[in-house]
Amino acid sequence: MEHTIAVIPGSFDPITYGHLDIIERSTDRFDEIHVCVLKNSKKEGTFSLEERMDLIEQSVKHLPNVKVHQFSGLLVDYCEQVGAKTIIRGLRAVSDFEYELRLTSMNKKLNNEIETLYMMSSTNYSFISSSIVKEVAAYRADISEFVPPYVEKALKKKFK
């Protein structure tokens, strides 16, 4: 049987339990999961690329088939480099789908061999976004149910 590799891209600024839910649910469907931290030219990050990588690595260390990498450029190029045939994207709501559909269409034009798999977030995470978590953290509210402990500590330090 063919060794299957999937890529889960994102800015992960920072990683949340919503992201982790999608990553964990993907691990038993593919032999290898690459969490690909994309440097997004449109988003100015709260955490540096290196900090985001560290937060993700700490959050997924219990998942042996997950690798964390950074990449700037076209996602389909990264997929080709690592031999991935699938991109996994998490969806929280219909509004996410419209944006994701445009990305998927472009990726298909660039490389017809790569498929995109959409996973609905679990209902208890459907309202969580990195932006909302950061906003709540800035007011020093409890964010423990939204992010792993290591990330919570890093956010508290950022918003001292």
UniProtKB/Swiss-Prot annotation:
GO terms for molecular function: ATP binding; pantetheine-phosphate adenylyltransferase activity. Its cofactor is Mg(2+). GO terms for biological process: coenzyme A biosynthetic process. PPAT is a validated novel target for antibacterial therapy against Gram-positive bacteria. Keywords: ATP-binding, Coenzyme A biosynthesis, Cytoplasm, Magnesium, Nucleotide-binding, Nucleotidyltransferase, Transferase. ATP binds at residues 11-12, 19, 90-92, 100, 121, 125-131. One of its GO terms (cellular component) is cytoplasm. Pathway: Cofactor biosynthesis; coenzyme A biosynthesis; CoA from (R)-pantothenate: step 4/5. Reversibly transfers an adenylyl group from ATP to 4'-phosphopantetheine, yielding dephospho-CoA (dPCoA) and pyrophosphate. This is Phosphopantetheine adenylyltransferase. It comes from Staphylococcus aureus (strain MW2). The gene is coaD.
